Regions:
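Non-catalytic cap/lid and distal C-terminal segments of serine-dependent acyl enzymes
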Residues: 1-269
Length: 269
């Protein structure tokens, strides 16, 4: 596979942003060998997996800490990993000169990737996955823009009720960050960061959704289980899976990214 790390000045982030990408390259051995001119000039469009990193991480973590490049190579797909800082994939309108991470993905990065690279823009061939804070981003994008994705996977996270800040430290942290981004809790409730409300509103339009966690993860009882109960009580279709003994860790996420690719029909070629 080809690995690209590129920086470009974003209109929505008001700064340069680093994006890591994995792209199919010329098969060099076996029956998949092809002529370079034929391969690169074929005009073929490949499925895209959008991968959102967690808090205190960056766009390089999935490259450095998992075998995602190998798994993408086996399936001949494009993987896109943007850098979101600690934004919770929200629009921070009062930060610096504005840091509109939520809009950046759908309004800037997706058009860039779909038009500059051999990436399919067909929603049925675009999938999104993220761990921890990235899971909040996944839920937010799929709930508010179900028309853009063929599936979404939330790893090691649950989506809290914005009125539930007294549940515990982890829940309060998510709600606090989303409130800060919007300039207040009521403002957060009125926009795309009210993820549960968006899920209820668009529950008949949602693509296939998946959510998993390790039972030793501190998010398990405080965030994951209440979120699972919420989906069941509101008729929101989502597949849930728990892994005994795993914590908040890359060993689990490396296993899960393979399972998710298969779940979304991105099979080994």
């Amino acid at each position: 596979m080809s690995h690209i790390s590129f920086d470009f000045r974003s209109a929505y982030l008001r700064k340069s942003n680093t994006v890591h990408m994995i792209l199919p390259d010329l098969p060099s051995v076996g029956p998949r060998f092809s002529d370079p001119k034929e391969f690169y000039g074929s005009g073929k469009k490949y499925p895209v997996l959008w991968v959102l990193h967690g808090g205190s991480d960056d766009s390089s973590d999935w490259i450095r800490l998992t075998n995602i490049e190998l798994y993408a190579r086996e399936r001949q797909i494009i993987v896109v990993m943007p850098d979101a800082g600690n934004s919770f994939y929200a629009n921070w309108k009062q930060a610096m000169m504005q840091f509109n991470m939520y809009d950046f993905l759908t309004e800037e990065l997706m058009p860039l990737v779909h038009n500059w690279f051999p990436a399919s823009s067909d929603p049925s061939e675009n999938f999104i996955v993220g761990q921890s804070m990235g899971g909040v981003g996944v839920a937010k994008y799929v709930a508010n823009h179900p028309e853009l994705f063929g599936g979404g996977a939330i790893l090691s996270m649950g989506i809290p009720d914005l009125d539930d800040a007294d549940r515990g430290f982890l829940t309060a942290n998510v709600i606090t960050q989303l409130s800060r981004a919007n300039g207040g809790l009521e403002e957060a409730k009125a926009g795309p960061d009210n993820i549960r409300a968006a899920m209820i509103r668009n529950k008949d339009k949602l693509p296939p959704m998946y959510c998993s966690i390790g039972t030793a993860d501190p998010h398990y009882e405080e965030l994951y289980l209440p979120f699972k109960k919420f989906t069941e009580e509101n008729g929101i279709k989502m597949e849930f899976k728990e892994y005994e003994g795993y914590g908040h860790e890359w060993r689990l996420w490396d296993l899960e990214i393979q399972r998710i690719m298969d779940l979304f029909g991105l099979k080994t070629i």
